[in-house]
Every structure is written in C-alpha cells, then in structure tokens.
C-alpha cells in the first residue's frame, strides 16, 4: 500500500479487496531505513475496511515494542528485519515467538546484502521469510536479479528441514518477473508500483495471480 493514493485511500483499499489476497503495509521509522511512512492510525483505518489479511512489514528498530499493538489494530501477518535484531542486540527467535503469541503469522525479513543462510536457524520459528528484492525503505526501486537464486536457496533449506515456512518477495515485483519468482519458490509476491501506478491495477493483479501465488 506504500504506492497507493493516500488522498483516496479507501478507493485503493476496495480495489485490493476485490482483486488481491493480502494487504502489504510498509511501516518505516526513518531509523532502520531512511524513509518514514505511517503507523497505527493508518493500519487501523485500513483494517476497518479490509476484507483480506493485513501483512504488516516492520522496517523499524525494536519491533518487539510494537508487535502487540499492531496485532490489536488488525495485523494478520507481521514481519521484522533481521538487521533490526542485529542493531538492537535482540533474539529474532524470541520476537517471532512473540508475534505468534499474539495470534499473528510471524515473518523474518532480510535485505539483499544479508546472506540468506542467516535466516536458516529461524525457519522453524517463522511462518514466512520475506526476501527483499530491493533495499528496504523506498518504493519504486529496480528488481535485483539475484533474488531468484536467493529464493531457491531458502526454499531448498525449508524443504531440507521439513518445514512449511512460506517465502514472500517484496520489491520491484511485476508481471514480468512474477512467474519466475513463483517457479523459484516464492508463494507471496508484493507488488506496489506495478499495481498502483498501472492504468488498470486489477489487470496487473490478475496477470500475477495466474501464476498461482498470493
């Protein structure tokens, strides 16, 4: 929703309700990432109109302080960055458990410069891994091509551990790469600019959903 028209947000919420499966909400604090987006009031307002799951992506420091509140205002999925735990000196497994204890699907996100192997110890604690295909913090960036290999590697490790953890990809996603991402193992694709800047957003979503992904 970062690329939505915030002056006419209800219209875009209804479009997502009718065509997509998940609302992806980017929460940025200007500390972990350079940009600032929105917080509880916007998420809560969207939750009141949304008929699909709210996937809240926390690009913030100390996400453990805010997980419960985001769950209360309507999040059904919450992810946070491994880089936040590195910065804060917190245990990712503990935060993932906290998210689950609030009745929400738990996710761990990594930027393109973080080795994917670093998420392997936490696959059993996470419901999904968010593989960023751009650097977190701004919408409209160009898709990073080595994301395909990173997704394949995480998918193989999930299978090796015998887990059901899903893979989400966010950043520069469009109909031109959706099929290849699905083939690599992605099950949830986040498309912002490709959808909201399109002349026919519903058509773009339909093209990507034809690849059997969320």
Sequence positions of predicted segments:
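Conserved N-terminal beta1-alpha1 strand-loop-helix module at the mouth
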Residues: 1-79, 83-93, 98-101, 106, ...
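Short glycine- and Lys/Arg-enriched binding-loop motifs that mark or flank ligand-binding interfaces
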Residues: 26, 35, 133-136, 167-168, ...
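Conserved beta-strand segments that form the floor/walls of ligand-binding pockets within enzyme
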Residues: 79, 109, 130-133, 168, ...
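Internal catalytic-core helix/loop-beta-alpha segment
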Residues: 105-109, 113
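Short acidic loop-to-helix transition motifs that present clustered carboxylates
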Residues: 113-115, 174
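Strongly charged, low-complexity linkers/loops
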Residues: 134, 140-141, 162-164
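Short, glycine/charged-rich beta-strand-loop motifs at protein surfaces that mediate ligand recognition
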Residues: 139-144, 170
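Alpha/beta catalytic cores of nucleotide-metabolism and tRNA/nucleoside-modifying enzymes
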Residues: 161-169, 174-178, 182-214
